[in-house]
């Protein structure tokens, strides 16, 4: 009899401890959402925009924890080393999940091996802008000027390895032109010097410069997206301007540490996709210049690998590497 009771209890423990059972009860406590950047940036905004809907759907608080530093490596390393139980997740950027893998020689985490990807949340294109004092007002004029004046065109960026910096590198590779990179500590400083005419051109986030464009403080030459930007309908895409294979988006997405039970991954990913499509969240993100993607874990994982390969090729060709 005692053996029978023990067997029944053991079987019950197996069922209760199974991944499916864990997912059914998940989450049973607050979930930490790491943001590997300071408050107020794109990843931070994306993460905070979905937490109310997640809390409502899943019945637990989602606590945003900013862990900035080392171009997002500090926060990403914290996620990689966390317990893979679904109670620690992260919202990161194209840099966190793709560019850093190719850019840094001694990266403290591996984007392709340390994480399970949940959903690519949002994306937004860059816009190629020029100082009003710069002679070129179209992509063709810029390329022509750059070829006639080797290494004279200055490209401002928010920092080495940023999406705006690598957009400039890719642009020069595609057009077989030259230029000088001028990295700043953030996009704000780069934009200020661009408006002041201290630098010539830059690839900047649409939302960050559209008001300056509309006010006539900057000239917009082209959009890096596959379609024209809703807020800048008169600005052509790079493809329309004759530059092929240069569709570039900055993007944010969500991940958990590798080893998180699949049922928990599926439940959290579905909740995130639903939260991103929630009307108010969707409207808020669109108003900030983001396009909601909300794809599946498999789609995001495949996209992440494609992005790593793409930017690794660009970075290696340009011989860029950071310690």
Where are these regions (language model features)?
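Sec-dependent signal peptide recognition
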Residues: 2-10
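C-terminal segment of classical bacterial N-terminal signal peptides
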Residues: 8, 14-22
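N-terminal (or domain-start) structured segment
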Residues: 23-114, 151-152, 160, 175-203, ...
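An extracytoplasmic/periplasmic, membrane-proximal ligand-sensing/linker region
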Residues: 28-30, 173, 177, 214, ...
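Stable alpha-helical elements in mature extracytoplasmic
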Residues: 42, 46, 50, 54, ...
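Hinge/capping helix and adjacent helix->loop/strand transition within the periplasmic-binding protein
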Residues: 81-87, 94, 102-189, 238, ...
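A ligand-binding cleft/hinge motif common to bilobed small-molecule-binding domains
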Residues: 97-106, 172-174, 201-235
């Amino acid at each position: 009899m005692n053996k029978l009771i023990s067997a029944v209890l053991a079987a019950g423990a197996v069922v209760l401890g199974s991944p499916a059972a864990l997912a059914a009860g998940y989450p049973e406590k607050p979930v930490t959402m790491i943001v590997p950047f300071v408050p107020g940036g794109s990843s931070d905004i994306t993460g905070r925009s979905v937490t109310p809907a997640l809390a409502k759907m899943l019945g637990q608080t989602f606590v945003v924890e900013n862990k900035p530093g080392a171009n997002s490596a500090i926060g990403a390393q914290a996620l990689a080393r966390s317990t893979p139980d679904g109670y620690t997740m992260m919202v990161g950027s194209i840099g966190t999940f793709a560019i850093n893998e190719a850019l840094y020689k001694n990266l403290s985490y591996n984007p392709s091996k340390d994480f399970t990807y949940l959903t690519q949340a949002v994306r937004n294109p860059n816009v190629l802008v020029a100082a009003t004092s710069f002679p070129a007002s179209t992509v063709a004029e810029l390329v022509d000027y750059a070829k006639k004046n080797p290494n004279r065109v200055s490209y401002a960026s928010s920092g080495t390895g940023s999406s705006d910096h690598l957009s400039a590198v890719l642009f020069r590779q595609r057009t077989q032109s030259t230029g000088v990179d001028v990295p700043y500590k953030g996009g704000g400083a780069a934009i200020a010097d661009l408006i002041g005419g201290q630098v010539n051109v830059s690839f900047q986030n649409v939302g960050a410069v559209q008001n300056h464009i509309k006010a006539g403080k900057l000239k917009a030459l082209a959009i890096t997206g596959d379609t024209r930007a809703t807020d800048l309908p008169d600005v052509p895409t790079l493809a329309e301007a004759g530059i092929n294979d240069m569709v570039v988006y900055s993007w944010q997405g969500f991940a958990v540490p590798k080893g998180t039970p699949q049922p928990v991954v599926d439940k959290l990913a579905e909740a995130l996709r639903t939260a991103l499509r929630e009307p108010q969240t969707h409207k808020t993100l669109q108003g900030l210049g983001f396009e909601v993607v909300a794809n599946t874990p498999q789609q995001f994982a495949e996209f992440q690998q494609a992005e790593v390969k793409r930017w690794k090729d660009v970075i290696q060709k340009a011989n860029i590497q950071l310690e």
